[in-house]
């Protein structure tokens, strides 16, 4: 159950935003082997001057198409994370026109006790999930 939070510069139209979210979800399903209906995405849009995202010395420029993706997830093997990064960059570029240099991903891991999907229960601990 990854939770994806997207920080974007405001101005994308609804169809572009939907495509971005759909592509990201399909990559999560493929790379992390989660069920199709396991979809949790939140979008935060910011004025351009509210995001200062540089290249960390890698030598490229960012554009207004910038996507900063924070993923909260249970622990995943390194190879699945690498697959996620690669597929996401490839598909956002090919399907959404977002350059791989405009993608930043951070994965924060947590454990089964850190999730409740409602009803005041930790369903991963109770066995309901």
From Swiss-Prot:
Entry-linked InterPro entries: Tauto_MSAD, Tautomerase/MIF_sf
Catalytic machinery residues: 2 (proton acceptor)
SUPFAM superfamilies, A to Z: Tautomerase/MIF (SSF55331)
Keywords: Isomerase
Documented EC number(s): 5.3.2.-
Gene3D superfamilies reported in the protein's UniProt record: Macrophage Migration Inhibitory Factor
GO molecular function, one term: isomerase activity
Pfam families reported in the protein's UniProt record: Tautomerase_2
Protein family per UniProt: Belongs to the 4-oxalocrotonate tautomerase family.
Role description: Putative target of GltR.
Protein name per Swiss-Prot or TrEMBL: Probable tautomerase YrdN
Organism listed in the record: Bacillus subtilis (strain 168)
């Amino acid at each position: 159950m990854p939770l994806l939070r997207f920080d974007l510069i405001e101005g994308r139209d609804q169809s572009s935003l939907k495509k971005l979210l759909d592509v990201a979800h399909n990559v999560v399903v493929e790379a992390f082997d989660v069920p199709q209906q396991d979809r949790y995405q939140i979008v935060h849009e910011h004025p351009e001057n509210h995001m200062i995202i540089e290249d960390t010395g890698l030598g490229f420029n960012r554009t207004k198409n910038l996507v900063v993706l924070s993923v909260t997830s249970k622990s995943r093997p390194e190879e699945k994370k690498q697959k996620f990064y690669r597929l996401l960059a490839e598909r956002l570029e090919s399907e959404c026109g977002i350059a791989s240099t405009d993608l930043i991903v951070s994965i924060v891991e947590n454990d089964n006790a850190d999730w409740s999907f409602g009803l005041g229960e930790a369903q991963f601990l109770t066995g309901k999930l």
